[in-house]
């Protein structure tokens, strides 16, 4: 739920982004240049579409963004967004994602969050499991040398998961964008150079 006094909420409304999360991706991309013109991008857990909007703007009309979520996401202006409604862990949904892209992904984005219970240890464990599912998806559909960006909730399970990521990527960094709420336990893991 958005806090109406939140400056990023207000900025998103003013600038036409579907969520304040758009600024997290904008900031990460400005610093790390993970998105480029013509790229093929998957946005896992894309609802409501803020990250897909940003990715679509950067990759341009020669690129493609394939968004997947269990919640219906409205079309995004620009014509380079394809939405697939469903659970990305299911084989038939994965097949739709792959055939929609037509080639391996250059970048896989995931700002996905589990349904939060308010029990920090449980929510963090569910976050790690979701991230493991995204990593497994990336193992199959991300091109060699590609980039994976994941949101995760900090906790005791993260260290072990970082080791898993380092087995699959040349470089793994933890990021906390300034647009992320200070009180939030979320961080982003940027994984570059898929092995």
Annotate each predicted stretch with a short phrase.
Residues 48-60:
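Conserved SAM-binding loop of SAM-dependent methyltransferases across substrates and taxa
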Residues 30-36, 101-102, 140-141:
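Glycine-rich helix-loop-beta junction characteristic of Rossmann-like nucleotide cofactor-binding loops
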Residues 37-47:
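Conserved class I S-adenosyl-L-methionine
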Residues 1-37:
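Class I SAM-dependent methyltransferase Rossmann-like catalytic core
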Residues 85-88, 103-145, 156:
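Mobile active-site "lid"/loop adjacent to the S-adenosyl-L-methionine
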Residues 152-195:
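Class I S-adenosyl-L-methionine
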